[in-house]
């Protein structure tokens, strides 16, 4: 990881700007996954690069943060992915309280969790003044997600979900915090 940050990826001059996506299994962190988290923490501590994690079905985010924190990682430099796949507000609030960012990044995957419920959780976070710790994105992971194959496509977040947020009472400033300002701050 450190070599890809400092020297370049696969012999190129392209250098990694983030340590990602390190993940855990549903409901547990296996010994091998723990090794990867420790390696990511070492790379972060040496390079200062931010870390992005993967949770399986919105589980183990708090445990991921505890593991990284035990290795000396500044949790304000960590974003926990896939926090929006179930009713998870209590854990999201705890992760934010620890200083981490949370990602609502499976937008459009209504077969896992409906966007209406994602919007309700975002309202709860906005009402608490916590949008400054939330990032929005999409997890396009299969060809079936592409428009050419009948999926919702890469533009769904901007053309469908953001208008739904706006109609539900979010301001453009709220949206900009989650789409622009937070990612910019995270990468500084």
What kind of feature is each model-predicted range?
Residues 80-86, 105-123:
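Active-site glycine- and acidic-residue-rich loops that bind
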Residues 1-45, 101, 106-111:
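Active-site gating/metal-coordination segments in enzymes
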Residues 50-56, 77-85:
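Catalytic beta/alpha-barrel core
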Residues 156-188:
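Mid-to-C-terminal alpha-helical segments outside catalytic/metal-binding sites
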Residues 105-106, 130-151:
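Short acidic/histidine-rich active-site segments
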Residues 47-50, 69-77, 94-103, 132:
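Glycine-enriched alpha-helix->loop->beta-strand junction motifs that scaffold or abut catalytic
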Residues 44, 102, 139, 175, ...:
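Divalent metal-coordination and catalytic microenvironments
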Residues 30-34, 58-72, 89-96:
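Distinct, well-ordered alpha-helical segments
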């Amino acid at each position: 990881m450190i070599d890809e940050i400092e020297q370049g990826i696969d012999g190129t001059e392209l250098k990694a700007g983030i340590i990602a996506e390190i993940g855990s299994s549903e409901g547990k962190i296996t010994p091998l996954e723990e090794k990867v988290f420790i390696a990511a923490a070492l790379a972060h501590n040496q390079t200062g690069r931010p870390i992005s994690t993967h949770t399986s079905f919105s589980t183990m985010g708090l445990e991921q943060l505890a593991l990284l924190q035990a290795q000396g990682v500044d949790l304000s430099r960590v974003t926990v992915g896939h926090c929006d796949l179930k009713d998870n507000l209590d854990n999201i609030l705890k992760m934010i309280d620890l200083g981490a960012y949370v990602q609502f990044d499976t937008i459009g995957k209504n077969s896992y969790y409906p966007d209406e419920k994602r919007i309700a959780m975002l309202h709860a976070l906005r009402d608490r003044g916590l949008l400054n710790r939330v990032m929005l994105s999409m997890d396009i992971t299969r060809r079936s997600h592409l428009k050419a194959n009948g999926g919702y496509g890469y533009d769904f977040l901007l053309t469908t979900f953001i208008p739904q947020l706006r109609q539900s009472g979010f301001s453009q400033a709220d949206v900009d915090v989650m789409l622009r300002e937070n990612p910019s701050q995270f990468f500084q």
